[in-house]
Amino acid sequence: MIEKRKEEHIRIAENENVSAFHNYWDDVYLMHEADPEVNYDDIDTGVDFLGKHLGFPMVISSMTGGAEIAKKINYNLATVAEKYQLAMGVGSMRAAIVNRSLSDTYSVINERNVPIKIANIGAPQLVPQGKEAIDEKDIAYIYDLIKADFLAVHFNFLQEMVQPEGDRNAEGVIKRIKELSGSFNIIAKETGSGFSKATAQRLADAGVKAIEVSGLSGTTFAAVEYYRAKNEGNAEKMRIGETFWNWGIPSPASVYYCSDVLPVIGSGGLRNGLDLAKAISLGASLGGFARTLLKDADQSVEAVSRNVEMIEREFKVAMFLTGNKNVYELRKTKKVIGEPLKEWMEV
C-alpha cells in the first residue's frame, strides 16, 4: 500500500497543478546595484553548513523513495548532487522499515559521493497511531542505510488530515525528538505549511540542529491528497483538501521567523536561482528544491544537470547585481517586501 501511495504522489506532482495559489517569493525584491563593483568570475558560491562544505547553497530536498520508479529518480539526483557538491535528502523512509525489499530505492544514492545525505522519517511515526511507534532501532536502520549525516523528521500533519489513511495523533512528538536528538543529528522539516518561530524554538530546545521550513508557496500536499481522494471517489477528503489547499505560513516569512532560532533551509516554492538568492537574503543558510527538479530527475541526469546549472547561473547573476562577492555578504543585502507577504513579516 505504501509503494502504491508513493507512485501516486510522484505522478500527481508531475502531472497536476498542486501549487499554492500565490508564490510568496514574488513579494521579495532585492535591491539592484547599478555599479556592483564585483567581478562576476570571482563570485564564490561556496558555503559551510553544520560543519560540512558545499559548493553551492542548495539542497535537493526530500522527494521520493519506497517505489521502484523512485530508484531511478534518486540515482539521477544523487549523481547531480555529487557533480555540483549539493546536499540531498530522500523521501520518507518508512517504506524501507515496513518492507526491506524497498531499501535499495533509497540506498542507491550511496553509489554516488553526495557531500551531505539526509535520511527521512515522519513525525507521525514517532508516536503511537493505533499501533506502536517506530523505535530507535528502526531509525538507526534507515540512518545507516544511506550513511546519513542528518535525519529529517518531516512534519506533515496537514497532509495526514487529508489522506484517506492519515494519522491523527501529534501528542508526544517533541518529547520523542528530544530523546532521539542524543543519537541522531535531526533536521525538522515541514512539507508545505512552514514553521512558526514558537515551534522553531520548541524544536531547538529539543535538540534539533536545523529547520527546513518548506512553507506555503510551492507544492501543497493538501492538493496532492485532494487528487488522490478524487481518484478514490472520497468526497469528504476531497473537500478537506480543497478547503485547506492554501493553509500555512508563507515560505519567506517562515525563513524570516526561524533564522533567529536555528540554521534554516529555505524551501517551499523555490523555482530558480533568484528565488534562492531571496531565501538567503532573508536568513536561510541553504535553499531546498524539490518539485522544480522532479520531472527532470524522472528523465535523465542530463536534464537535472541543465536545470541545476541554470539555477546556479541565476543565483550568481543575482549576487552580481546586488554587489555581493560571496554568500555571506548576500545575507545582508537590502530588500523590499511587498504585499501580501509584508503583513506576515510584521506578525
Curated annotation (Swiss-Prot):
InterPro entries in alphabetical order: Aldolase_TIM, FMN-dep_DH, IPdP_isomerase
Example of a GO biological process term: isoprenoid biosynthetic process
Example of a GO MF term: FMN binding
CDD domains (alphabetical): IDI-2_FMN (cd02811)
Keywords, in A-Z order: Cytoplasm, Flavoprotein, FMN, Isomerase, Isoprene biosynthesis, Magnesium, Metal-binding, NADP
Main location: cytoplasm
Family, as annotated: Belongs to the IPP isomerase type 2 family.
PANTHER family: ISOPENTENYL-DIPHOSPHATE DELTA-ISOMERASE (PTHR43665:SF1)
Protein name: Isopentenyl-diphosphate delta-isomerase
Originating organism: Thermoplasma volcanium (strain ATCC 51530 / DSM 4299 / JCM 9571 / NBRC 15438 / GSS1)
Lineage: Archaea, Methanobacteriati, Thermoplasmatota, Thermoplasmata, Thermoplasmatales
